[in-house]
Amino acid sequence: MAKHVVIIGAGVIGLSTAYALIKAGQTVTLIESETDVGMHTSFANGGQLSYRYVSPLADAGVPLQGLRWVGKNDSPLNLKITPSVHQWSWLAQFTLACNRKTNRINGDHLLRLSLLSKNMMNLWRQKGDLGDFAWEKSGKLIIHRDSKSFLKANETADKQFQKTLTPAEIIELEPSLKHIQSQLVGAIYAPDDESADCYLFCKNLLQYLQTQPQFNLCLQQSVQYFIKQDNRITGVATHQGIIQADDFIVCAGNGSRELLKSLKINVPILGLKGYSLSVKYPQTENTVPKINVTDYGNKIVYAKLNDQLRIAAMVDIGYDTAGLRENRIKALKKIIKKTFPELPQVDSAESWFGLRPSTPKGPPILGKTAYHNLWLNIGHGSLGFTLAAGSAEILTKLITEQKSPISLTGFTR
């Protein structure tokens, strides 16, 4: 029997979930507080669909590195300690997860979900509903300038799907990296990884959904509170009235924690600030990458999205209330110029920041809450676009009372 499902949050996670539910014959009401969809973390993210490279941020050595990077504008990670009890709790859980064993366990959970997501994205594209969203099977090249990090990456690489490259092989594959060849010690190449424009994907999802009579979009409406009866949610209250439904899914990213507090549901999600630059893709060949590149040491990703080059970087913890930090953008541009000195218009690139809704251990939170018709699809961090289709499929299967396509071990609070 078809259900009416309310989804809270219209970023790539909420829209993907709406699409999967509509395809499964359900009725969907999508609630979004902004004037349009995809306006937060989904708007100008890195654009990489890195299905084979999903290692959590929490890893051995990261806390010590973070302390060494304090106050350095060009460092991959900036940390500002605040009086927030939530931040302290999140950092404590993050620190406990910063060891090789836990990193590998959570990395395996993420890989399980990302491979499901890859399969679902391929199926969605084959349906022909989603138009052009700058999708390319461009491959991903993870370059290393440090021998220790490269040896670790080589140990954990899946040699069936990933290749180890020497500096000479790196330049042969991606000649635009010629200016830093002397700094490179090696790379991991994943030829099957993809890239796409997340915001364009969101807009195309919405365009399709709005052709479906079972879909309703409520923009500029914030959920003020849940209406509950025993262990069920019967509705949500917005300033425009009460919306009732059979099931409710929270896909509200960074807003999820405050929203769920009224139900005494605590979720360990913290907004980790990241930055991106968008610059016109140059016509001159071998000026910038044709394939996805991740500069591992600097934590910078490069992706070609139609006629744009998207460059995304950095993690700032404790800066969730501030706007664009110009000193970080300036430092990012300086690194880009050293890596790709022939790239024009870096100084005039369009700057953006977003807050990645992140769990301490890395995997998102998926599944049912103590309220048996309230579901969570939150905490995807920097992998929201990569994991969106798989997460949507899981929630759709669960809500339609079917078995999850993968084990949900590791995806709970």
Feature map (PLM): residue ranges:
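Glycine-rich FAD pyrophosphate-binding loop
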Residues: 23-43
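Active-site substrate-recognition segment that forms the wall
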Residues: 45-48, 53, 57-96, 223-228, ...
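N-terminal Rossmann-like FAD-binding beta1-loop-alpha1 element of flavoenzymes
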Residues: 3-30
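Helical element adjacent to the flavin cofactor pocket in flavoenzyme catalytic cores
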Residues: 183-239, 243
